């Protein structure tokens, strides 16, 4: 069980397709794929980011290539957003990194057979499922290592949710939540944190029993906060909102990679998983969803409320060695400090709404921020 040198990582960003004037979601994913040269069945690319259809025609997924360094991934994230937006402009729309649409009415699922079956089976849950997440894939050596990682990182994942929170509005109203996407997403029967699996066989047994109930239609509907990827030799960290700022997306990806490496290192050393109970992790997810970084979060080691900065600092200390080995320590500190200083996307959305109380302003501001890469930094807050 030798240590992997530097793990590759990549991301999937789900972006909202919106009218740039009134902010309404537009069902134009197929047109965007056509313009960009991708299809519903072939979204492969060897030369850069690619586009893919998603559950709703009002959203588009951007997939990065696997990357070795943060610099490479930053370029992929920016290029992916630009690619999607350029194609959206060609069909009269824009794309915005909004985890929920501020203005929305329930719509049918996208047109493929699988999504249609989900729409039939899950009714209003599927019709209202227009949310945009951010998934980080981190390479693993084996399913056994991957499950060991899942078992050891599960109680840290709510911190990533808090740092990404970007969905305060839903159906035209301020929900009071920083990440209301989490509340919408958790209506799916397999969503959320899981118990310790113990082994790759244990993981497969859980999947088999869940699929045997007939509730999830297929393995693609296993919506754990983190899971083994079906198509790649990776752990897929799925808990985060899509981040309004591209640099925040990079920060979440860096933290996720370091968390995977730290968890794998613990396994190699024979350290057991934390005994934190799954219902407590659900409480941590709820607080992260409710408050983002604006209030107290549950400390992963104490299972008690602490200031968000203290909890974020605990995560950085926990993964410091992995961040140092990958050369990402300073970048991670800067990224987390920026999020704590100016807030996540939920704060900018509420500020945009507060100026004129128009939800269209939220969308137009989000469009600009999605494609603005010139944000200043502040690394001092978490330098200790």
UniProtKB/Swiss-Prot annotation:
Pfam families: GCS2. The keyword Nucleotide-binding applies. Its EC number is 6.3.2.2. GO terms for molecular function: ATP binding; glutamate-cysteine ligase activity. GO terms for biological process: modified amino acid biosynthetic process. It catalyses: L-cysteine + L-glutamate + ATP = gamma-L-glutamyl-L-cysteine + ADP + phosphate + H(+). InterPro entries: GCL_type2/YbdK_subfam, GCS2, Gln_synth/guanido_kin_cat_dom, YbdK. Gene3D superfamilies: 3.30.590.20. Keywords: ATP-binding, Ligase, Nucleotide-binding. The keyword ATP-binding applies. Coiled coil: none annotated. PANTHER family: GLUTAMATE--CYSTEINE LIGASE 2-RELATED. NCBIfam families: gshA_cyan_rel, PRK13517.1-1. ATP-dependent carboxylate-amine ligase which exhibits weak glutamate--cysteine ligase activity. HAMAP family: Glu_cys_ligase_2. Belongs to the glutamate--cysteine ligase type 2 family. YbdK subfamily. This is Putative glutamate--cysteine ligase 2-1. It comes from Paenarthrobacter aurescens (strain TC1). The lineage of its organism: Bacteria, Bacillati, Actinomycetota, Actinomycetes, Micrococcales.
